[in-house]
């Protein structure tokens, strides 16, 4: 008999790493300038600051280092006094003793509004340094192979269906030993404690090793990063080193990996560095929001693999500090959103108008969780004789993500959210709040909701496109560590991020596109662990009713009768548009060439299965923690 979601996540939380564990207390760093107040994380605001001075420890790659001392409790009691750990000044800015001009501040409702930079305690001196500022220290530091190693429940993935389209598709592999990746890379795979390939890796790696172009559709969290990094690193190691111009300050990478966001670029860079450890393949990252001179210094020291966002890469190309004429491998991660969210002109200019070798000469790999037909047509301009690979959605054939839709009026969303969070905390292990990701549509909405959650006793942080890179990295570290277990985010900011142990995704504002919904709920139920996705639906989401109903039916979820009625109403208009889903059940896309010419290869059928009931276990449906037991470790990105 199927147990409730609350039971499964509670059992898993006992065996999995405790993300909500209290962080080690950090000594308060005294600021030499009394006119600046120290930044205090949301869960500690209102507490009396510590007066004991002590040297601050060196920042680690995943350490959260607030200026105020960190308390062992998961929550900070709301007490009297200023939220920002300092008395308000007469000029209304909240700065102590000085008329500091805030930047990007917003007034308004929602618990006080206010942008991140309007917070008086957040000064540039308090921010984390650029993680890539000290290149010598980076090279000397050993790579931590266990950072993202959280354990995989492989039983949940045995029957995931896979489809391939195209001619002469290389056969899949079952073990890494079947692939000639080179001794150094194989050693790094062992260091990462990867046991066997994930479904997307079983197919994508042989296809890429064979030199074929690839369009791969697989859910975030299914191992896409390793699927394109392994063949790239192996190919660079086995090829003859190119002759680069001597005395030039221009960098000539052999591989280019593009991603839509800064955080995803940093994430890919960290993973690629692990895989390239002691191989002689140097990986460099370049993204906006960080000092460009630091990145230029890294590029001057040599680069084989360049991970970049489109905007920063265009800047480097226009400065003639990067040349693409030696690029042999081009990979686009989250390719559908890069082509759909305004990056298409930049991507076309980079690929077609700069000095990059043309398609057919270079090898191109496109990866994403969804590939609608219109995006496939656009992306096919960059590919030559490619193979289309579709890996079944995790959650469409296994009991991983329980989807729940509630009808909530716009005016009632906040009170309903509070009820969910209270129930989740009460049912969580040791009364701790499970990691919860709340999606909203606008940057202003993210700021307002974060402030409102804080004023109601919930430690929360937020991330969106107006944050500086340091602020976004700090917020992510605070969320991952459990210091602020509620993260309010917009789509773009959280795109493609690999955040382990997210127990609950709440669509506070539903997106306009069903593919965005698929990407959002993919933040939970990762690596074989169970998760819960809750959506707030009302009359404003009528266009999403039909595709949402179809998606839940495909996943064997219980569809509310009221949602079926809304779905029927929206069907009278003919449906279609962006929300007419391609690919049918279980896949984020289907090769559009099949519809054009009726062809298409075979592939691995896989089992099927389903969610197995879709119940929520009564009142415990919002229990804390994360599901799935510990299993064999593998290369999930």
UniProtKB/Swiss-Prot annotation:
Domain Helicase ATP-binding residue range list: 205-389
Record-linked PROSITE patterns: HELICASE_ATP_BIND_1, HELICASE_CTER, Q_MOTIF
Superkingdom assignment: Eukaryota
Keywords (A to Z) from UniProt: ATP-binding, Helicase, Hydrolase, Nucleotide-binding, RNA-binding
One Pfam family in the UniProt entry: Helicase_C
Domain Helicase C-terminal, residue spans: 416-567
Catalytic activity: ATP + H2O = ADP + phosphate + H(+)
Motif extent (DEAD box): 333-336
GO CC annotation: nucleus
InterPro entries, per database record: DEAD/DEAH_box_helicase_dom, Ded1/Dbp1_DEADc, Helicase_ATP-bd, Helicase_C-like, P-loop_NTPase, RNA_helicase_DEAD_Q_motif
Biased composition annotated in UniProt, kind: Low complexity: 10-28, 46-68
Gene3D superfamilies reported for this sequence: P-loop containing nucleotide triphosphate hydrolases
EC number of this enzyme: 3.6.4.13
CDD domains per UniProt: DEADc_DDX3_DDX4, SF2_C_DEAD
Region (Disordered): 1-68, 86-141, 570-610
Annotated ATP binding sites: 218-225
Basic and acidic residues: bias regions: 588-597
A GO molecular-function annotation: RNA helicase activity
Annotated Gly residues bias: 104-116, 598-610
Sequence motif Q motif, residues: 174-202
Family: Belongs to the DEAD box helicase family. DDX3/DED1 subfamily.
PANTHER family membership: ATP-DEPENDENT RNA HELICASE DBP3
Domain commentary: The Q motif is unique to and characteristic of the DEAD box family of RNA helicases and controls ATP binding and hydrolysis.
UniProt name for this protein: DEAD-box ATP-dependent RNA helicase 37
């Amino acid at each position: 008999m199927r147990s409730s979601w609350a039971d499964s996540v509670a059992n898993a939380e006992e065996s999995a790493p405790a993300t909500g564990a209290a962080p080690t207390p950090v000594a308060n760093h005294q600021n030499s300038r009394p006119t600046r107040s120290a930044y205090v994380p949301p869960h500690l605001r209102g507490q009396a600051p510590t007066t004991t001075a002590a040297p601050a420890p060196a920042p680690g790659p995943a350490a959260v280092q607030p200026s105020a001392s960190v308390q062992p409790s998961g929550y900070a009691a709301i007490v009297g006094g200023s939220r920002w750990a300092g008395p308000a000044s007469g000029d209304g800015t909240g700065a102590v003793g000085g008329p500091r001009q805030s930047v990007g501040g917003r007034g308004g409702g929602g618990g006080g509004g206010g942008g991140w930079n309007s917070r008086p305690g957040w000064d540039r001196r308090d921010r984390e340094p650029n993680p890539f500022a000290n290149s010598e220290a980076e090279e000397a530091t050993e790579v931590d192979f266990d950072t993202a190693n959280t354990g995989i429940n492989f039983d949940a993935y045995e029957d995931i269906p896979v489809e391939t389209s195209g001619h002469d598709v290389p056969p899949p592999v079952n073990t890494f030993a079947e692939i000639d990746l080179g001794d150094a890379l194989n050693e790094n795979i062992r260091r990462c404690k990867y046991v066997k390939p994930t479904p997307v890796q079983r197919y994508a790696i042989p296809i890429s090793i064979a030199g074929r172009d690839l369009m791969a559709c697989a859910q975030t969290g299914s191992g896409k990063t390793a699927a394109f990094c392994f063949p790239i690193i192996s190919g660079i190691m086995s090829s003859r080193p190119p002759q680069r111009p001597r005395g030039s300050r221009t960098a000539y990478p052999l591989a280019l990996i593009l991603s839509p966001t800064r955080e995803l670029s940093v994430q890919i860079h960290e993973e690629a560095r692990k895989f390239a450890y002691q191989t002689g393949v140097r990986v460099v990252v370049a993204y906006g929001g960080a000092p460009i001179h630091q990145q230029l210094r890294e590029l001057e020291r040599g680069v084989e693999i360049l991970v970049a966002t489109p905007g920063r890469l265009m800047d480097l190309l226009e400065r003639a500090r990067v040349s693409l004429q030696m690029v042999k491998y081009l990979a686009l991660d989250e390719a559908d959103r890069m082509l759909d969210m305004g990056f298409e002109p930049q991507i076309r200019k980079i690929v077609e108008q700069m000095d990059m070798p043309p398609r057919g000469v270079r090898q191109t790999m496109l990866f994403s969780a969804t590939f609608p037909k219109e995006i496939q047509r656009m992306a096919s301009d960059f590919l030559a004789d490619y193979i289309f690979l579709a890996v079944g959605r995790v959650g469409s054939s296994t009991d991983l993500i329980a989807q729940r839709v509630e009808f909530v009026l716009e005016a009632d969303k906040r009170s309903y959210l509070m009820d969910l969070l209270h129930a989740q905390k009460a049912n969580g292990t040791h009364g701790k709040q499970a990691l919860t990701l709340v999606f909203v549509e606008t940057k202003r909405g993210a700021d307002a909701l974060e402030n409102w959650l804080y004023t109601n006793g919930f430690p929360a942080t937020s991330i969106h496109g107006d944050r500086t890179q340091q602020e976004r990295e700090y917020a992510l570290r605070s969320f991952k560590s459990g210091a602020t277990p509620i993260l309010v985010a917009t789509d773009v900011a959280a795109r493609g991020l690999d955040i382990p142990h997210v127990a609950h995704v709440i669509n506070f504002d539903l997106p306009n596109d069903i593919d965005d919904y698929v990407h959002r709920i993919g933040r939970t139920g990762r690596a074989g662990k169970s998760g819960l996705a809750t959506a707030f639906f009302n009359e404003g989401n009528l266009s999403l009713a039909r595709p949402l109903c179809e998606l839940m039916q495909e996943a064997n979820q219980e569809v509310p009768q009221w949602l079926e009625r809304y779905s029927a109403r929206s069907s009278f208009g003919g449906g279609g548009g962006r929300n007419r889903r391609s690919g049918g059940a279980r896949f984020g896309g289907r090769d559009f060439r099949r519809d054009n010419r009726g062809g298409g290869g075979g592939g691995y059928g896989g089992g099927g299965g389903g969610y197995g009931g879709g119940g929520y276990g009564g009142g415990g449906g919002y229990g804390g923690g994360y599901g799935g037991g510990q299993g064999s470790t593998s290369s999930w990105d």
